[in-house]
A protein has these predicted regions:
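Intrinsically disordered, low-complexity repeat tracts enriched in Pro/Ser/Thr
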Residues: 5-6, 14
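Polybasic, lysine-rich low-complexity intrinsically disordered segments
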Residues: 3-4, 26
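Accessible peptide chain termini
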Residues: 1-3, 32
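C-terminal catalytic "cap/lid" subdomain
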Residues: 33-342
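Short, Lys/Arg-enriched N-terminal segments with co-localized hydrophobic residues
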Residues: 13-31
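Short hydrophobic transmembrane-like helices used for membrane targeting/insertion
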Residues: 1, 8-10
């Protein structure tokens, strides 16, 4: 088991200095050893439109292929906020044209987004691996995740989906019975329930493929939220937090590391203020302390740190790496990002 280390806060100019690199390399252990990892892709890895996604996944595929070449065994999960919102809007518009058409519920839209996003990632990564002479199966698994029907999240929706809307568009959403949240100076965004995940229904299928050293894309968008009703599974009108399911997936697969890719290069202390400073590493206790201090914003960095804490409490030999797509290659070598250890 790794020894806990005090958190390291560095200035931007120190991010690639030799001392910073040496410290992180020692904490990470032998980078050439085989590692089972869950990689969680954020919005930046996928874009917001079909065209943006097509271009973005090519860049994402190169970064993921780099990890495969470094002998990482990958299980990939991804965001779907913009995609599920786009699909839901399209299905709603279809209802306006065809009055007898039944609008697609959120769970169905989530299922569609898993296939849509998984298809692009799967094919782009497969092509990138083959271009490097690597023949490795890449598969997307439609994944359901059980939730508690009495989860308090159903009574207080907080999960943001889709792009910013004008006040007029927000009022239309409210009339439909949907929840919206205002962001001063930016506009409005739709919010839905984000219940906690209980069990990943298809975990055995995911585990079987992962143990066969195949690249697996699963739990897209947090998974399709379902409620158990005797032997049946009923879709829930909700979206599961992708970071929460990424942490659970890493626990269920007993992974060596959880890699969370986001819009920023690392975790920052006092983010957005004049005192802002990057955190190179922190241990589990320090992560909890930062959470209690309110250092991380809800809906952005907070769920990532909470997922890291949950994973490390259950897999004490593991580690969590938080960085951006741009710096992932340097981060896995200990030159960038934020490393969280037990």
């Amino acid at each position: 088991m790794r020894k806990s280390a005090a958190s390291i806060v560095v200035t931007p100019g120190q991010a690639f200095c030799p001392q910073y690199h040496d410290t992180r390399t020692k904490q990470r252990g032998n980078p050439m050893s085989k590692k089972k990892v869950v990689v969680s892709l954020g919005h930046d890895a996928l874009g917001y439109t079909t065209t943006e996604q097509w271009d973005a996944v090519k860049i994402t595929a190169r970064a993921l292929a780099d990890l495969v070449e470094e002998d990482y065994q990958l299980t990939i999960t991804h965001s779907n906020g913009p995609q599920v919102s786009m699909i839901h809007k399209a299905m709603t518009e279809l209802r306006r044209v065809y009055i007898d058409y039944t609008p697609a519920p959120m769970c169905v839209c989530s299922a569609m987004s898993q296939g849509y996003v998984g298809y692009d990632i799967q094919n782009s990564l497969r092509a990138e691996l083959l271009s490097r002479g690597i023949s490795k199966p890449v598969s997307t698994i439609l994944t359901q995740v059980t939730v508690d029907p009495y989860d308090e999240a159903f009574y207080e929706p907080t999960k943001v989906i889709g792009r910013y809307m004008s006040k007029e568009d927000a009022e239309i959403e409210i009339k439909k019975g949907n929840y919206v949240k205002e962001y001063p100076g930016k506009g409005f965004r739709r919010v839905v329930a984000a219940p906690k995940p209980i069990d990943i229904v298809e975990i055995e299928a995911i585990r079987t493929l992962a143990e066969a050293d195949q690249v697996v894309i699963a739990c897209g968008g947090g998974g399709i939220p379902v409620i158990e009703q005797q032997h049946a599974l009923k879709g829930a009108s909700a979206v599961i937090e992708k970071d929460a399911i990424a942490g659970k997936l890493a626990v269920d697969l007993n992974c060596d590391e959880l890699i969370i890719l986001t819009a920023v290069d690392c975790v920052y202390k006092d983010f957005g203020s004049l005192r802002q400073a990057p955190i190179a590493s922190m241990n589990l206790q320090e992560a909890k302390q930062y959470i209690s201090e309110g250092q991380f914003e809800a809906g952005t960095m907070l769920p990532k740190i909470e997922a890291a804490v949950d994973y490390l409490e259950k897999v004490p030999r593991g580690s969590v790496l938080i960085t951006s797509m741009k710096y992932i290659k340097d981060a896995v070598k200990g030159k960038a990002g934020t490393l969280i250890i037990p």
